[in-house]
């Protein structure tokens, strides 16, 4: 099947950023919010210092996004490549996470959240599609699922709700579909549908789009999978009727709507209670949180003396502040027909839920790591 990919963006922003950085780059943020991307590009070029400081990942993510919006797809991918390499260079383990959470936000480097890392590959895939490079676009969407597996390995005892990306699987299906590989397209669509109906519906309140169901039926038919076709016809309560495809192909329309959330922070104050015999407890009365900590054997005398002099500990954690979407729905009108757009990915929901999972999983380690 011949597809034409159309990507329409209204104030779409992949980087959540942090509140202090957001305030310092007000002119850039204002230019982006007004759709003045040439001005935003000039502001980035003028402030090359950001490319070398602790927020250099943010700089290259912003550059990749702005170049994408300007239609400079190769330049966009060059910036995203640098951002991707920088994220891979950062250590990914619980000790580092704890240190990041409790250190001074003005000193620590910006560390992208998991969904932001995934969005790098998403935008690289879109760039390759715009360059009509289906093969490399497919590589990027495959990397999304591999990267999700790697990211989830960081939290073996507190698995994320964001373990599979349904939209990445859907995009993979579209690319296979465009290449005429209907069997692999069906497999990708099926994976996407299963992820929507399990992970996404349960965790993010998002069910499979109707168009995905239609594509699943069509590719099952085109692949000669009669049993699968019959099963999905029964499940969807709709009969598939083969129809000739338009000679000039079909339009795939993506609408990327809204800004990602802004990252701020919140803190919890713990009071130390010495239980004796090397056992202390960190307690927060307001939230009802209590974490026991043994500091006997294995700790030096200096460590024990330092801990003995501490009565109160404040641990700082990240949080998100949502920026509402400018539009709540969209409709395409063509040839006398209206097509209502359906949401396929809710970045806000993913951001809030996964951050909650991460903080819940490492809060105890962060309290202990403070010492």
Description of each model-found segment:
Residues 15-37, 48:
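Bacterial Sec signal peptide processing site at the extreme N-terminus
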């Amino acid at each position: 099947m011949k597809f034409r990919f159309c990507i329409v963006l209204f104030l779409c922003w992949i980087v959540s950023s942090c509140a202090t950085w957001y305030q310092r780059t007000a002119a850039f943020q204002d230019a982006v919010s007004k759709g003045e991307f040439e001005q935003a590009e000039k502001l980035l070029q003028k402030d090359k210092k950001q490319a070398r400081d602790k927020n250099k990942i943010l700089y290259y993510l912003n550059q990749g996004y702005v170049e994408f919006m300007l239609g400079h797809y190769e330049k966009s991918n060059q910036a995203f490549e640098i951002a991707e390499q920088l994220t891979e260079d950062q250590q990914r383990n619980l000790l580092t996470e704890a240190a990041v959470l409790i250190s001074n936000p003005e000193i620590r480097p910006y560390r992208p959240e998991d969904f932001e890392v995934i969005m790098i590959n998403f935008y690289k895939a879109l760039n390759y599609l715009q360059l009509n490079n289906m093969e490399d676009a497919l590589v990027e969407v495959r990397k999304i699922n591999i990267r999700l597996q790697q990211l989830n390995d960081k939290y073996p005892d507190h698995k994320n709700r964001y373990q599979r990306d349904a939209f990445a699987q859907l995009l993979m299906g579209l690319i296979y579909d465009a290449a005429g590989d209907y069997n692999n397209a069906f497999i990708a669509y099926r994976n996407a549908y299963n992820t929507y109906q399990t992970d996404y519906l349960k965790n993010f309140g998002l069910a499979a789009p109707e168009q995905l169901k239609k594509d699943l039926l069509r590719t099952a038919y085109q692949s000669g999978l009669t049993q699968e076709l019959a099963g999905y016809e029964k499940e969807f309560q709709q009969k598939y009727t083969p129809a000739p495809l338009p000679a000039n192909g079909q339009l795939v329309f993506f609408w990327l709507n809204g800004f990602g959330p802004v990252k701020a922070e919140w803190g919890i104050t713990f009071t130390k209670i010495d239980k004796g015999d090397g056992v202390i407890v960190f307690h927060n009365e307001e939230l009802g949180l209590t974490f026991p900590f043994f500091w006997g054997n294995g700790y030096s005398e200096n460590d024990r003396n330092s801990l003995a002099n501490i009565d109160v500990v404040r641990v700082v954690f990240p949080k998100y502040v949502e920026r509402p979407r400018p539009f709540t729905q969209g409709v395409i009108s063509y040839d006398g027909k209206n097509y209502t757009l359906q949401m396929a990915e809710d970045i806000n929901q993913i951001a809030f839920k996964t951050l909650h999972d991460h903080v819940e999983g490492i809060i105890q380690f962060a309290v202990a790591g403070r010492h």
